[in-house]
A protein has these predicted regions:
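Flexible, membrane-associating and regulatory peripheral segments of lipid-active enzymes
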Residues: 2-153, 159-170, 180-194, 220-222, ...
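Histidine/cysteine- and/or acidic
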Residues: 171-280, 292-293
Length: 538
């Protein structure tokens, strides 16, 4: 049933994408014709491969469709629509002032509440969204609570609608226009230039931020301080070269959060490639916890609405990127949001990359607070390549969890050998006291499968934190199958004999080794509290 739901969702995903291409073919044919266009108050004549966009005597940019904008990996490439149609709005928010629309044509710093010497954040949306969407307002509000800053919301909703290929083209123009606004602001920032500017974009908005950065560099010789890409869109951007897509060269620091990076044909909306100075892959960057329900369950949760249910099903992984980022803005003393560098997520979850190293060079804070640590400890070494970081999150808010590496050694005693191996799963609860009456975590599942006598099993799990790791509670859950006689236990009680368990806490840098009391086996469904002093019986 789960497989069917997933396949049905992928099929619908493909259908929706194809429907969004309606009209793209005709636009593509026309885009190679000879143009005479009126944009704003100015007239321009374009060649068959270039269009220029201007208003009130200000040219925002001239765009062509030559390589790399059209390539084997991007066979369809369009011009942006008319400026008068897609003209973006810029909504400025500062502490103590009501949101106001910033007019680019007659920008006057004295008529706004913008303080050019304070941090400047730009936040923008993706395909089929607008600047008034809840997640953008949540990020803006949280940034303003966290520090005295300027937040500029880029609303390009007039150009973000279908077909998708046209929205892809429109962000080139929106990025160029936004770069001109930032250039005007930079006239008031002095030596800071735009080092204190940070552009944050989701999906198509992430690549839009890249176009802001490239335009600032090419036209004004200014490099923006930071760009954060929240699951940058994959369709039309995968396997293409900069400046077609966002890249670490677009800003002094580029960090990417990948949450839906499966290939598009498999249902993924986000780009797979590592394209930033730091690329975070929560939960491996694909299937996010809490997003595993079938499409029909989402329709049911949406009160039977097919459209809303399918939309939530298709976008759950994709929107996790801005949900994680929002949570990372406000430091939580109870959860540090630590990430670990590792060659692959499989290596990370199997425990091969656990630990931060002597100088903590393997770890980075996740999301918003990662830049300072990166530049202090890693900047020179990793400046020209991508730093790949992994973490495991929870299913629900708060998403931040602490990581534990667990090593389980199954007993090789005679009793264990006589009983033989068992098929099932161990569940761990970390305790802050040896009597089990104090602070404890929620249970978390360990390796599921066959556990043989003398076997050694290691994995990384994530759950809540405890102030001090003092004891571990284990529960064995036996897996039986009606169709597999080897799992039947008719004359014997399902149980497993353990020798010892070692648990290491990444964030708190604690380690504990516990054992079952008097070598007592773990019976199916019966929790057992284990503490270090019980290891004296072995």
């Amino acid at each position: 049933m789960v497989t069917f739901c997933k396949n049905a969702g992928i099929f619908l995903h493909a259908i929706f994408f194809l429907l969004n291409q309606s009209g793209a073919g005709g636009a593509q044919d026309n885009s190679y014709n000879y143009y005479y266009m009126q944009i704003g108050q100015d007239n321009f004549i374009e060649s068959n491969t270039t269009r220029c966009y201007a208003k009130n005597d200000q040219v925002f940019g001239c765009f062509d469709l030559n390589y790399p904008w059209t390539s084997d990996h991007r066979p369809v490439s369009l011009f942006p629509e008319d400026l008068d149609k897609i003209e973006p709005q810029y909504i400025l928010q500062t502490r103590g002032s009501s949101p106001v629309v910033v007019e680019l044509s007659n920008f006057n710093l004295e008529l706004t509440s913008l303080n050019p010497k304070k941090p400047i954040y730009l936040v923008t949306h993706g395909y089929m969204e607008g600047g008034g969407i809840a997640w953008i307002n949540n990020i803006a509000r949280t940034l303003l609570l966290q520090e005295d800053c300027n937040v500029i919301i880029i609303d390009w909703s007039r150009g973000s609608g279908p077909p998708y290929t046209q929205a892809v083209a429109n962000i080139r123009l929106v990025g160029a226009i936004t770069a001109h606004l930032l250039h005007r602001i930079s006239n008031y920032t002095g030596s800071l230039k735009l080092d204190h500017a940070h552009a944050i974009g989701h999906s198509l908005g992430a690549h839009l931020c890249g176009y802001i950065g490239y335009t600032l560099q090419q036209k004004f010789n200014i490099t923006i301080g930071r760009i954060t890409g929240l699951d940058p869109a994959e369709p039309h951007f995968s396997k293409v070269k900069p400046p077609v897509r966002l890249d670490r060269s677009a800003a002094k620091y580029v960090d990417i959060i990948h949450t839906d990076s499966s290939q598009f044909i498999r249902g993924g909306l986000g780009i797979v490639e590592s394209i930033g100075h730091v690329d975070y892959y929560p939960n491996g960057g694909t299937d996010q916890p809490g997003c595993t329900k079938g499409v029909f369950q989402y329709i049911k949760d949406a009160n039977g609405s097919f459209f809303n249910g399918v939309k939530k099903y298709l976008s759950c992984n994709h929107i996790r990127s801005h949900e994680y980022f929002l949570e990372s803005i406000t430091p939580n003393p109870k959860c540090k949001f630590v990430t670990v560098s590792c060659p692959s997520f499989q290596d990370f979850t199997s425990g091969k990359c656990f630990g931060c190293g002597k100088s903590r060079e393997n770890c980075l804070p996740f999301g918003f607070n990662g830049r300072k640590y990166y530049e202090k400890h890693l900047g020179n070494k990793w400046r020209h390549t991508s730093r790949i970081q992994y973490l495991i999150t929870g299913e629900f808010k708060p998403f931040c969890k602490h990581h534990y590496r667990i090593v389980v050694q199954v007993s090789s005693s005679n009793m264990s050998k006589i009983h033989g191996g068992e098929i099932g799963q161990l569940y761990f609860t970390m305790h802050g006291t040896t009597d089990g009456r104090g602070h404890k975590t929620n249970p978390v599942g360990f390796v599921s499968g066959f556990h043989e006598p003398g076997g050694l099993y290691m994995a990384v799990v994530a759950t809540d934190s405890v102030p001090h790791l003092r004891a571990v509670e284990l529960e064995w859950r036996y897996n039986s199958s009606l169709f597999n006689p080897l799992t039947w236990r008719i004359l014997a009680t399902p149980r497993i004999y353990l020798k010892k368990i070692t648990v290491e806490a990444l964030e708190n840098e604690e380690s504990i080794t516990v054992c079952p009391k008097w070598q007592k086996p773990l019976a199916n469904g019966v929790p057992q509290l284990m503490i270090p002093s019980y290891c004296q019986y072995f």
